[in-house]
Each structure stands twice: as structure tokens, then as C-alpha cells.
Amino acid sequence: MSTPQFTEGEIDFDAPGAGKPCKTWYKVFGDLSSKTHRPLLVVHGGPGVVHQYLLPISQLATDYGIPVIFYDQIGNGNSTHLPELKDDKSFWTEALFRAELDNLIVKLGIQDDFAVLGHSWGGILGARLAVDHTPGLKRLILADSLTSMELWSRSLRELRAGLPQELQDTLRKHEEDGTIHSTEYQAAVGAYFQLHVCRLNPMPEELISTFAEMGKDPTVCVAMYGPTQFEVTGPLKDYNIEAELDKIEVPTLLINGKYDESRSYVIQKFFRPDSGRELDEVCAVQPHAAPGRA
């Protein structure tokens, strides 16, 4: 696999309440100025993840000439970090990340014609763009995403209940004891990830580096989602876009995996006869990472 050419940079982002200037870091594979192909803007998951695990998608630039844009959301990766706001749940909102995304689209000059791939939490932001009829959004891909946190949480409970009893006991013990950072608990979470996050063995380096970056600064993840994978305690716990789905008019491709946390019923309400829907029989929540899938 050849490595496509890329450029990277930072743009200013005015984040009310941040208390300091903020920047959004981005990386573009291919040439945005050519205008021969519609650019694809890739929105990473989390909240609190970084772009690295999605990098296999950059091969689209080499194979098809499609410019592919990645970025790290505020609080993550190469963008401005705000650990001093870790307890301020009024700051860490969906609206903040939507404003950052709008700012990025305009500053990169793609606001008249672009496509979005939103993965997991990134799909929440992508769906919001579509519901709001964002000008210039021509195509949408929602990968491993959700229509409501209630359905997502139900899926997590069911998948956890399917783990070997020993792993379930380990998870429960450390959660009750407040020792979720212990090696034993993290190993149990890792076993769950191997089943329902990425089944490739070994895991791709891009995903390993993503987890490492998350560990350096969990501010966004803990503030918006919660301290563990299995219970949503942050502002996202009440997320539900189902009443607005009929506003989505842009052609949309839905992707989830056979072993995915985003099980079919989690995304089913997105589905309409004029949308595409694919069930990947080999992947968990990282379909882009499977060989030949970029």
C-alpha cells in the first residue's frame, strides 16, 4: 500500500468558555484545490479519541484521487487540550464540537461541496449536519453510529453479558471497588475490545496509537461519556436524534459490523429504502481497519 501525499496545519477556533485561544489540527491527503473530486471529511469517534485509527481511509486519495481530511477534535491529539476543564460538563457539549466542525469546513474552503464519514461519536456530528441541512453536504457515511444512547447502552449491556463469567466478575468487582485503572480491569476491557471493538489480531498500529493518545488525556471522554466503556454518565447519556431522522435528505450509507457495539438495532432507525446499508460479516467496530476495506 503506497502512502499518499499529505499536508497538515492548524486553524483558529473560538471556543466560548475555554479561557484561552484554541486551535484545531487537521491533515489533508490529496489536493483540495484540484476540485476534480469531492473531498471526504472524516470525523473520528469518542468523544475523546483521535484521528489515527482512521488513517487507512487515506488510501482513497491514492487509489481514486479523493481528497481525505482528518482532524483531531478540541481536547484531543494535536489540537488544543483543556484538562483544566475536565469537570466542566457545561463546556463539553455536542454543540461545541459541531461549532468546531462548521469552523473547519469553512476555513478549509470546502463548504460548497463535501462528503462526511462519521465514525461512532463522529456519526452523531455527521447526522446533525444532515438533519440541519448543512449547505454543501452532498453525501454522508455513518459507520458504527447510533440513533439514541438508550439503544447504544442496551447493546453494551447485552455484549457485556455475553462475556465469559470470569471477565464479567472482574469488571464488576473493580467497578464496585473503584479500581477501574487496575491492570486486571484494563485487561478485561482489552478482552472485550478484542471481541467488539477490533477483532484483528494483532490490532493495527493506528488503533494502538489511538488508545495510547486517549490514555494521555482522558478529559473529553470522561467529561462527555464517562470513566468506563460500559456506562454513559456524561451529557451524552440523553442523546436521541430519532425524532429528527426524517429531516435527513442527503444520500446516506450506513455501516455496522456483525460483532459491533453498534448492533443492527442501534442504527436501524436511520435506515430508509433510499439509503444504503451494509452489514460487514468480518468486522467489529473498526470496518475501515480490515484488509482491503479502506
State each model region's role:
Residues 16-90, 104:
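Conserved HGGG/HGGXW glycine-rich cap/lid loop of the alpha/beta-hydrolase fold
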Residues 289-294:
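Post-His helix in hydrolase/transferase enzymes
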Residues 235-288:
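Conserved loop-alpha-helix segment in the C-terminal half of the alpha/beta-hydrolase fold
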Residues 95-114:
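Conserved acidic catalytic loop of the alpha/beta-hydrolase fold
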Residues 160-246, 250:
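Alpha/beta-hydrolase
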Residues 111-155:
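Conserved hydrolase catalytic core segment
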Residues 1-23:
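N-terminal cap/lid segment of alpha/beta-hydrolase-fold proteins
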